[in-house]
Amino acid sequence: YGLTPGIEMTTGPLGQGFASAIGFAYGERFQRGLLDPETPKEDSPFYHKIWAICGEGDIEEGISGEAASLAANQKLGNLTVIFDANRIQIEGDTNLVLAEDVLKRFQAYGWYTDEFSFIQPDGSYKEDIEGLADVIAKAEKAAPDQPKLIKVHSLIAWPTPGKTNDPSSHGSKLGTEAVAGLKEALGYDPEENFHVDEEALAHARKVAERGLEAHKEWDEKFDAWRKANPDKAALYDRLKAGELPEGFDKALDDLEATFEVGKGVATRGASGSVLNAIAAVMPELWGGSADLGGSNKTDLK
């Protein structure tokens, strides 16, 4: 974040990215409710879906469990997580440390779950993207109001000779010899570096063209929204500019005038008063504290 255009945040520890994806899904719904609440979601320029890819390491972390519970409780149907389950960690098979049935755990949270395997019944391996797309489409149709977890059984480092499905592929580089073997297995010259297929290049250019067309369609939808909603458009412009609303300072000054000099007030009570004073002029203010609002005064009236 801050170095590359288009990146909105950089995550660190395992599980943080999983929780962040849920935050993005939650944020989409909040933003749409703030700026375009009356429009059917599919027709709103602010509606979009969140796609995330995670591995066993993310699933093992406690933060992902807490965030997953929140996502189900809030019915974040705009979120789909692809769970790459290759059963490999640095020390060997993930069964050494991950014993539970992950899909059943997520079902218990309230998620829609399904699975798909690139490992074929005869033991061969095929990364069947079309088949996976069908499973995702089925999930989208079956569970529009639930977050979705699709478990994909895969092989790490396939088809690298001597490295496929091997724990050493998880935490260290493949090495020159293994990379040469991978190139050969994929039909490339093992001695050639930094090569991009014409077919891959053409595909990437088509993706860019498709993106430009989608962007044009979105711009038209957004412009129509701006013309139809001048007040909301003004709010959008202020939010994008990162500016405070009119009346912000006055709201705090008015609140300060209500406090009696020399009369004690609990810090949490003062904090709650400030939050509600700001919320009256700042509709984008959003927060909470699990189930402790009545105690720590974070609930907005």
PLM-predicted stretches and their roles:
Residues Y1-W51, E213-K301:
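Thiamine diphosphate
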Residues L3, I7-K206:
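Glycine-rich ThDP/TPP pyrophosphate-binding loop and its adjacent helix/strand module
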Residues R210:
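Active-site neighborhoods and metal-handling regions in enzymes and metal-associated proteins
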